[in-house]
């Protein structure tokens, strides 16, 4: 087996998806703790003490306690090398989260057992369905008062249309939470509260019928045995093939805050989650084992380091090997670039990379020439597909407090739009800058970042825009006529793509009727 093949086999690249406040950032901390990446997990609760969660590093995130940008963290666990992509949990950041899900091979779904399946989880699961991504489930907060675990598993099956296979099962809940039974290993791990910040010495009892169990947890032992009979009747057996097709999810229980049950889930993930999978391009399918390098950019993050005022393009390597100083082709521009200083991340802490393999995420320094969706190869002119832009759902006009800063405003907005934080439209008929987003919080982020990173003081005004559509037409003359006729409603986006800005949905319908040869797109591939 070649060194490259060995390296590919080691890798597991996954993202965590959940509804806000289900405990995603906490579980990220604990996963890193097990990966020895953090000695003491900086729980999100310790905000006032200045001990911020490692994966929430942007100013606004530190203030609010929400993960806005996607962090990437790599750590070793169980003879595997795990790449964890932390996605924004806040519902206003669905586009960024969506794109991150194009860069992973599996997902960990975190569910708050007190609340069950929530809206955001449903939306994210729809996205994973597009590529049938394998899903592992962690039922969180068992040390709180929660709903009946069986009921929540039924809800997952019914709402998310995925079979559940219980791998572990909780003993008690809330204040009476006693531990976890591992169904496949036939062993009980006993829970001790107050030790969430460290890796605990495990107290394990072998065998469900061990009399030791009755001694330690009393009547809970009989309750557990009864429950497990019900579970074996109602739950599905774990089937690796169904899991890899995205049809069945292994379910683990625990408490991320109490750092309990997380290791069971990690064991399952490293054992069952797929190694780097093949990827489609416009020409062919690329496998991770191929020797020649290829990768695509799924995110651009501005100013990760205020000291460096730079931008980093996050690239998922799909095949081959990155080596320091290597040449690669940037397909969109058909030009060769030498990459001498790619970085890996530990959420804001960087280290330079000597080599990286398929499944790894590396950061390229970007001075404006790299865009989301860019493909880099060893020379082949192919493009990875499936990294979409969505038409925004909310719009604002942006105004300067100081008119002399117009140039800085334009530069800042174009950079932020290339990064995918927001979409920018410049109408044909005036000098307005219209900003489009998927949620309100994105607007706040943009104003704050314009201020701190570009020294531009800007405010928003309401604007009557219902939606935007990208316009294309195969016939150049028809397109030119359309531009003349509909100029009042047309704009260019940040990438200079022609866009129809509709004041109402009725207006859009009429425009589509009157211009049957023009295609109005609600999504656009990067």
From Swiss-Prot:
Family annotation (Pfam families): EF-G_D2, GTP_EFTU, RF3_C
Key word Secreted present: no
Record-annotated tr-type G domain positions: 9-277
Subcellular location: Cytoplasm
Binding-site positions, GTP: 18-25, 86-90, 140-143
Sorted UniProt keywords: Cytoplasm, GTP-binding, Nucleotide-binding, Protein biosynthesis
Gene Ontology BP annotations: regulation of translational termination
Any one cellular-component term (Gene Ontology): cytosol
Top-level lineage group: Bacteria
Role description: Increases the formation of ribosomal termination complexes and stimulates activities of RF-1 and RF-2. It binds guanine nucleotides and has strong preference for UGA stop codons. It may interact directly with the ribosome. The stimulation of RF-1 and RF-2 is significantly reduced by GTP and GDP, but not by GMP.
PANTHER family the UniProt entry points to: PEPTIDE CHAIN RELEASE FACTOR RF3
Family label: Belongs to the TRAFAC class translation factor GTPase superfamily. Classic translation factor GTPase family. PrfC subfamily.
Protein name: Peptide chain release factor 3
Organism phylogeny: Bacteria, Pseudomonadati, Pseudomonadota, Gammaproteobacteria, Alteromonadales
């Amino acid at each position: 087996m070649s060194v490259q093949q060995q390296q590919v086999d080691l890798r597991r690249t996954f993202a965590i998806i959940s509804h806000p406040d289900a405990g995603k950032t906490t579980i990220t901390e604990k996963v890193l703790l097990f990966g020895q990446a953090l000695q003491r997990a900086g729980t999100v609760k310790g905000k006032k003490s200045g001990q911020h969660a490692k994966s929430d590093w942007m100013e606004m995130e530190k203030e609010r306690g929400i993960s806005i940008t996607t962090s990437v963290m790599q750590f070793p666990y169980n003879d595997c090398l795990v790449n964890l992509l932390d996605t924004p949990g806040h519902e206003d950041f669905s586009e960024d989260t969506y794109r991150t899900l194009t860069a992973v091979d599996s997902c960990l779904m975190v569910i708050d057992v007190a609340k069950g399946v929530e809206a955001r989880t449903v939306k994210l699961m729809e996205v994973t369905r597009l590529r049938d991504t394998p899903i592992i489930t962690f039922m969180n907060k068992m040390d709180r008062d929660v709903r009946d675990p069986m009921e929540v598993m039924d809800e997952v099956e019914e709402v998310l249309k995925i079979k559940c296979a219980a791998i572990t099962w909780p003993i008690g809940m809330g204040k009476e939470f006693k531990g976890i039974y591992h169904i496949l290993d036939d062993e009980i791990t006993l829970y001790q509260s107050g030790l969430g910040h460290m890796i605990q010495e495990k107290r394990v009892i072998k065998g469900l019928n061990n009399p030791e169990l009755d001694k330690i947890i009393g009547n809970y032992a009989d309750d557990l045995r009864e429950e497990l009979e019900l579970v074996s009747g109602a739950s599905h057996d774990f089937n690796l093939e169904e899991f890899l097709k995205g049809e069945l999810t292994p379910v683990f229980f625990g408490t991320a805050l109490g750092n309990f049950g997380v290791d069971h889930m990690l064991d399952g993930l490293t054992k069952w989650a797929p190694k780097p999978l093949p990827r489609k391009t416009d020409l062919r399918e690329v496998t991770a084992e191929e020797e020649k390098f290829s990768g695509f950019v799924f995110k651009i993050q501005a100013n990760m380091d205020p000291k460096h005022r730079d931008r980093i393009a996050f690239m998922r390597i799909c095949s081959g090997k990155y080596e320091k100083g290597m040449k690669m082709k940037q397909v969109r521009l058909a030009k060769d670039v030498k990459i001498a200083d790619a970085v890996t991340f530990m959420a804001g802490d960087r280290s330079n990379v000597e080599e990286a393999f398929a499944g790894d995420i590396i950061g390229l320094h970007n001075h404006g020439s790299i865009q989301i969706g860019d493909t880099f190869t060893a020379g082949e002119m192919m493009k990875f597909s499936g990294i979409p832009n969505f038409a925004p759902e909310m719009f604002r006009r942006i105004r300067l407090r100081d008119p002399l800063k117009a140039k800085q405003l334009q530069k800042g907005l174009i950079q932020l739009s290339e990064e995918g934080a927001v979409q920018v439209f410049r109408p044909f008929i005036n000098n307005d800058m219209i900003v489009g987003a998927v949620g309100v919080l994105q607007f706040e982020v943009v104003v704050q970042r314009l201020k701190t990173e570009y020294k531009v003081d800007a405010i928003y005004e309401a604007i009557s825009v219902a939606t935007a559509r990208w316009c294309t037409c195969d016939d150049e003359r028809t397109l030119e006529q359309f531009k003349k006729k509909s100029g009042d409603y047309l704009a260019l986006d940040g990438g200079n793509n022609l866009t129809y800005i509709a004041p109402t949905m009725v207006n859009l319908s009429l425009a589509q009727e009157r211009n049957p040869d023009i295609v109005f797109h609600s999504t656009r591939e990067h």
